[in-house]
């Protein structure tokens, strides 16, 4: 599960009802603003279609204004499409110069052992994230300040699960259909790995036959 709290700018409401993830939603095109349109994080907001205060606030939200949204980010296989944000709360009464972009990526894993050196004291590594109970995987980068390099070197193992706190970043080159996508991490955590046994793998019990394989019977 990937949690987000962000100030989001509404571009336009989507007129048609959206059926996604087994539920009916009302939707909107939106973005986490940036100084450049090439650097904004594009989103498709999905608000559960049920009468109530949240739905009213969502439908009354004015185009071109910002609201503080919390919810869950869903990454899909098609990286050319905006990220889906399933809205849990919305607060439209905020200062219009307010900025927030905080994400906790809870179902990520290391997609590589290779740590890349970037400009301005930044390092990066490829990570993957999956949909809940699914084989669908999206690839992106985790960017870190170089002061985290020792920790990353100690923890990295391809396929190892990782939980990340940071903010989302996208960049689109002119003509590209898919953006460069990263989570810029404040920090990350991993589960402690068990010590690998140096034993010979043989059973330690007293019964005999664990290391022997009999011929296959013809039943």
What are these regions (language model features)?
Residues 27-28, 70:
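Short histidine
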Residues 64-78, 160-173:
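Flexible glycine-rich surface loops and low-complexity tracts that mediate binding to linear polymers
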Residues 66-96:
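Short, structured interface segments
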Residues 1-4, 14-24, 31-42, 53-59, ...:
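Acidic, gly/ser/pro-rich intrinsically disordered tails
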Residues 9-10, 73, 109-110, 168:
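Hydrophobic beta-strand positions in extracellular immunoglobulin-like domains
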């Amino acid at each position: 599960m990937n949690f987000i709290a962000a100030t989001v700018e509404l571009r336009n409401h989507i007129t048609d009802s959206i059926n996604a993830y087994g539920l009916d939603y009302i939707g909107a095109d939106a973005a986490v603003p940036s100084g450049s349109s090439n650097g904004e994080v594009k989103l498709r907001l999905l608000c559960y279609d049920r009468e109530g205060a949240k739905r009213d606030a969502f439908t009354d939200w004015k185009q071109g204004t910002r609201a503080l949204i919390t919810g869950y980010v869903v990454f899909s296989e098609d990286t050319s499409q905006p990220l889906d944000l399933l809205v849990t709360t919305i607060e439209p009464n905020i200062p219009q110069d307010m900025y927030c972009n905080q994400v906790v990526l809870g179902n990520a894993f290391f997609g590589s052992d290779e740590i890349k050196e970037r400009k301005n004291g930044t390092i990066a590594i490829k990570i993957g994230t999956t949909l809940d109970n699914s084989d669908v995987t999206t690839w992106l980068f985790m960017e870190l300040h170089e002061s985290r390099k020792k920790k990353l070197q100690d923890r990295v193992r391809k396929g190892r699960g990782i939980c990340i706190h940071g903010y989302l970043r996208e960049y689109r080159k002119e003509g590209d259909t898919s953006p460069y996508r990263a989570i810029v991490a404040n920090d990350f955590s991993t589960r402690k790995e068990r010590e690998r046994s140096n034993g010979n793998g043989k059973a330690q019990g007293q019964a005999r036959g664990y290391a022997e394989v009999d011929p296959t019977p013809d039943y």
